[in-house]
A protein has these predicted regions:
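Catalytic active-site module of serine/aspartate enzymes centered on a nucleophile-bearing elbow/loop
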Residues: 144-183
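Flexible "cap/lid" loop of the alpha/beta hydrolase fold
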Residues: 8-11, 15-49
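Conserved alpha/beta-hydrolase "acid-adjacent" motif
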Residues: 129-135
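Conserved alpha/beta-hydrolase catalytic His-Asp/Glu region
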Residues: 31-36, 53-115
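Short beta-strand/loop motif that positions the catalytic acidic residue
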Residues: 116, 122-124, 128
Length: 183
């Protein structure tokens, strides 16, 4: 959500950064059931306590956590998997994530992206199964100042799979845009 929020803030002239980075960002409308008449039902379902509790309870199974991780296209180490499981088993966290997804509407952002002037780096895990890598190509067509770096073998959680590599890319992009980055 961070990249979409930052892009929106740039477009609304709330901020004027010299560089933006999107990590497997959901900048375009998500596929699936997004019909406007169904969205109030989706929002109602995710706003209550029962769905987050049910989801968190299902994540009590290590096998279910592994299935969820597999759907991201990412392969976390044992510690990363443990931390992901801990978060997934917390109703407050799952509730917040479900609420965010239930309220996600990037149609206005998609219409405005051609006006984005900040240099945008789209970092894409080639194995991402949540936000398909091809979405970055669509964003690049809309945003003249965008470029894509695709990372083979990494999924939606690329920042957790290869944090040092992601950090290097962010720093390199910032420096390329004249941002002073401490060594």
């Amino acid at each position: 959500a961070g990249a979409a929020i930052l892009c929106r803030m740039c477009l609304d002239a709330t901020i004027a950064p010299r560089a933006l980075v999107s990590l497997n960002g959901a900048l375009l409308p998500l596929p699936g059931i997004r019909h406007p008449s169904l969205m109030p039902l989706v929002r109602a379902a995710v706003s209550g306590e029962w769905l987050p509790r049910l989801f968190a309870r299902r994540m009590g199974s290590d096998a279910e956590v592994e299935r969820l991780l597999a759907r991201t296209g990412s392969a976390l180490d044992a510690r990363g998997t443990e931390l992901y499981a801990r978060l997934s088993r917390t109703p407050a966290h799952t509730g917040a994530a479900l609420a965010m997804m239930g309220h996600w509407d990037t149609r206005p952002l998609e219409a405005d992206l051609p006006r984005l002037t900040a240099p945008l780096l789209l970092v894409v895990g080639a194995q991402d199964r949540m936000i398909f890598p091809g979405e970055a190509t669509r964003v690049r067509r809309l945003v003249p100042a965008a470029r894509i770096i695709q990372l083979p073998g990494l999924g939606h959680l690329a920042h957790e799979e290869a944090p040092a590599r992601i950090g290097e890319l962010v720093i390199a992009h910032a420096r390329a845009q004249g941002v002073a980055v401490p060594s």
